[in-house]
């Protein structure tokens, strides 16, 4: 039997060699650019599919049976080329093939859904694709301006949200992962995105997945991912330069106008654009300017690219400025003499220097473009990263290996763009007469003593009403014109300067506190020395390995592991935080009958911070384990030509960032306070969708309809209030606040993150994307979408029952109302993007409409009548900017 087996094998091999002595070889090129196509497939059918793929130079060589055969040249994103060929015995034929890029929108190539290239029509989840041309037509100053035009995608205070998955995150803890070429761009410390880090000058394509994607991309992909793919060099050198300038329009209401022609001459802007001192020197309103320069080319076996970006924005809101300098590039070496195998390695590098300011509470209803003294914040940041990589592909056995690494360093510090108002300015705004202000400025503080007596009497007696009556009785004549904004200035000033010690002596026996005069002198004429800069430093070390195997039957697996170590040196906390994240993932994909695509995957992750070794702890069959597993599955079935139905289910999670859980941070007067008791967010997303391509006359595009359901457990939200600066606990009693003040202890205004037990978000998204071709030079591009969401707070009834018993003003409620909806989310949104292109001229418009915000933080409530009928007011009775 053994001899028979060997004989049979030898006969098969001999027969194979005799029948396949004929050779076809050549190159495969892009028909438009003449670039070689790497990895293009050349196949024919004979006892199953037979074939090869092209190498790094686009070369292919295939053995064929004698006689006639139909060859198919295929490449993802390109139209197939069918080539019938007749070849004689032992003949060698050379043929070059030119392939055209597919113009069908559903044939677009994406990689984010499965970490490998596939057609958009085959993915099992909702995905939007934005090409470089779409971005260029909108001329954005950063990529977030383009993303906010997509249906189902919102950018709230710079943080992305998919289908209501996030509200207002206060600058930390994004629930959507943002990637550049598969590498995270989220700040390792805060979990937030700084859009200035994205190399807009070199973006090739943006892929947006709406729904949990933690199996392949880990924590922060709870709500979805945004993968920004950069352009790669080709044989033809390419240089791109763009320059732009803009002028902000006047405020709709004249009293909102905060700038004038002399503003820049008096150095009242935090930044100064180049054109401000020349061409635009006479412009009253704020301006912005910028330019991009990029170059890429192939030199021998090297791919080289580089880019630079400068941008300066005075901001349409006072102190809402932005100034950035970004420089980066990449170097890739393609190993020659590898035959059909592919080996390349290199690195990407990027440096960013950034200064920007922002605020989230306006000064007053009539000064909506000016910051409240509580949120007077700016940031100075410098970061650098280098990402080495190595890729190996063996088409002969259908395997690939990819290794990516990163070293990241950042240094940043919070600054106040402007000094707080002085006490003399505050008194002047509040209507205090000139003589009193002059006396105070000259060192005569006697007019303030009655006020301190009134305040102190109430504080010492522990009676809030007495304290407030003391204030208004004693200061009624001093502050005749005081507004709420003026009192905010006064409170902010008091928080910065504190109160004198031994205040009870002034109340009880009329004796002045020993430090009263020095204290008043200091606050009236404060030292102008700049405060010591407290620079936080962040180090990140990252390593990712991925293995992929494909079989001829249409099956493939993707598996790998990641490791990340973060070191954060906090200047404010005077402490070093270290975290480790280790994960392994596996995904199986199968194509059946050339119609059905099935995908399933699993990931497990371990996470620790300092000595907290069980940050990812979970229960499996009742047993606690220090790691967290998550699963996903999906399918896509082609019903007919250009008709696809899909269904997916995915679990997700997000570990609280170091900033959310461990750090104390001042942000322009308002603080972020740590909470060691918050747990990771967990959740899942389920979706059923239908995609239909169409070509009606000159219209070509597709319609997509998706129903979705998302559930979160331990969802992290923040809550405003007063906090003890010593132990970071929330102050829930006026009596406790008074006692702290009388004891000389300070408290602060701020936010703290905590878990909301359960949230449910469900709804429907309907969109269409396409182009109308008038002729070869004239086109109309369009993208329209409507999203309905129902963002439910599943525990609102239990919370209302507890909050209904609150009697103290400092017992801060969760939301602005007792309804069932989550904060900072609308129910309805509609977006439309239309671009008309004639040759190289583009004219377009973006339109967005949203229904009212359903709830906000309780602290933002203001029951007073609205000051202006045209004032943007998200919910009736709420003054929030």
Listing of model-derived features with the role each one plays in the protein:
Residues 61-63, 183-210, 229-231:
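Short acidic/polar hinge/loop motifs at secondary-structure boundaries
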Residues 708-711, 730-859:
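Gram-negative outer-membrane beta-barrel transporters
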């Amino acid at each position: 039997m053994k001899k028979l087996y060997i004989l049979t094998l030898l006969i098969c091999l001999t027969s194979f060699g005799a029948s396949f002595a004929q050779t076809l070889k050549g190159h495969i090129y892009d028909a438009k650019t003449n670039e070689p196509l790497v990895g293009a497939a050349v196949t024919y059918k004979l006892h199953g599919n037979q074939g090869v793929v092209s190498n790094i130079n686009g070369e292919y060589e295939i053995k064929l049976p004698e006689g006639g055969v139909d060859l198919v040249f295929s490449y993802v994103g390109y139209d197939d080329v069918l080539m019938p060929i007749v070849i004689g015995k032992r003949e060698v034929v050379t043929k070059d093939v030119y392939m055209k890029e597919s113009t069908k929108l559903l044939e677009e190539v994406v990689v984010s859904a499965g970490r490998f290239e596939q057609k958009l029509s085959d993915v099992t989840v909702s995905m939007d694709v934005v090409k470089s041309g779409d971005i260029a037509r909108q001329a954005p100053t950063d990529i977030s301006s383009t993303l906010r035009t997509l249906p189902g995608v919102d950018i709230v205070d710079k943080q992305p949200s998919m289908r209501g998955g996030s509200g207002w995150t206060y600058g930390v803890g994004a629930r959507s992962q943002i990637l550049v070429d598969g590498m995270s761009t989220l700040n390792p410390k805060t979990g937030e995105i700084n859009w200035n880090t994205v190399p807009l000058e070199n973006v090739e394509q943006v892929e947006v997945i709406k729904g949990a994607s933690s199996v392949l991309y880990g924590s922060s992909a709870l709500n979805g991912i945004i993968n920004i793919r950069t352009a790669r060099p080709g044989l033809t050198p390419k240089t791109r330069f763009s320059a732009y300038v803009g002028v902000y329009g006047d405020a709709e209401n004249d009293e909102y106008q905060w700038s004038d022609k002399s503003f820049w001459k008096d150095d009242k802007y935090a930044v100064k654009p180049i054109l401000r001192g020349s061409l635009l020197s006479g412009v009253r309103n704020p301006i912005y300017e910028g330019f991009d320069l990029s170059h890429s080319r192939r030199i021998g076996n090297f791919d080289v690219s580089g880019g630079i970006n400068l941008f300066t924005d005075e901001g349409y809101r006072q102190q809402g400025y932005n100034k950035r300098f970004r420089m980066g590039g990449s170097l890739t070496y393609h190993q020659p003499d590898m035959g059909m195998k592919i080996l390349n390695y290199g690195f990407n590098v990027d440096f960013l220097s950034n200064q920007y300011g922002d605020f989230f509470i306006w000064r007053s209803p009539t000064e909506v473009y000016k910051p409240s003294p509580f949120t007077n914040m700016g940031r100075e940041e410098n970061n650098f990263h280098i990402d080495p990589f190595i890729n190996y592909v063996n088409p002969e056995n259908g395997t690939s290996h990819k290794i990516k690494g990163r070293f990241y360093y950042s240094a940043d510090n919070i600054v106040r763009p402007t000094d707080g108002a002085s006490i003399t300015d505050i008194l002047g705004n509040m209507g205090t007469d000139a003589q009193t202000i002059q006396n105070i400025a000259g060192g005569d503080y006697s007019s303030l003593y009655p006020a301190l007596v009134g305040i102190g009497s109430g504080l010492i007696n522990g009676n809030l009403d007495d304290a407030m009556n003391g204030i208004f009785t004693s200061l009624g004549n001093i502050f005749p014109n005081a507004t709420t904004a003026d009192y905010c200035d006064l409170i902010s000033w008091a928080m910065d300067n504190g109160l004198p010690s031994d205040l009870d002596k002034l109340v009880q026996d009329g004796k002045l506190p020993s430090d009263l005069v020095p204290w008043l002198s200091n606050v009236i004429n404060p030292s102008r020395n700049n405060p010591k800069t407290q620079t936080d430093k962040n180090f990140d070390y990252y390593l990712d390995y991925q293995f992929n195997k494909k079989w001829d039957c249409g099956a493939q697996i993707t598996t790998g592991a990641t490791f990340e170590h973060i070191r954060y040196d906090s200047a404010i906390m005077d402490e070093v935080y270290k975290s480790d994240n280790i994960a392994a993932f596996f995904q199986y994909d199968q194509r059946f009958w050339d119609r059905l695509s099935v995908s399933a995957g699993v990931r497990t992750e371990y996470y620790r911070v300092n000595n907290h070794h069980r940050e990812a702890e979970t229960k499996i069959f009742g047993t606690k384990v220090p790691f967290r597993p998550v699963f996903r599955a999906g399918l896509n079935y082609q019903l007919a030509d250009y008709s696809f139905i899909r269904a997916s289910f995915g679990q997700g999670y997000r570990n609280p960032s170091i900033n959310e859980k461990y750090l104390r941070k001042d942000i322009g007067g308002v603080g972020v306070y740590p909470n060691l008791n918050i747990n990771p967010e967990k959740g899942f997303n389920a979706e059923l969708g239908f995609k239909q391509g169409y070509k009606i006359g000159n219209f070509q595009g597709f319609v997509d309809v998706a129903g979705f359901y998302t559930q979160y457990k331990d969802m992290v939200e923040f809550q405003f209030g007063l906090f003890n600066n010593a132990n970071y606990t929330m102050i829930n009693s006026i009596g406790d606040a008074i006692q702290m003040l009388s004891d000389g202890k300070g408290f602060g205004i701020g936010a703290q993150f905590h878990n909301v037990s359960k949230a449910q978000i469900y709804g429907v998204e309907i969109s269409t994307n396409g182009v109308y071709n008038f002729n070869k030079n004239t086109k109309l591009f369009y993208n329209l979408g409507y999203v309905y969401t129902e963002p439910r707070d599943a525990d609102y009834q239990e919370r209302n029952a507890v909050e209904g018993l609150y009697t103290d003003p400092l017992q801060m409620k969760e939301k602005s109302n007792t309804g069932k909806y989550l904060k900072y989310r609308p129910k309805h949104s509609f977006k439309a993007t239309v671009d008309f292109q004639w040759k190289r001229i583009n004219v377009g418009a973006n339109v967005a409409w949203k229904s009212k915000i359903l709830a906000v933080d309780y602290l933002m409530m203001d029951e007073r009548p609205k000051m202006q009928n045209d004032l943007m007011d998200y919910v009736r009775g709420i003054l929030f900017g």
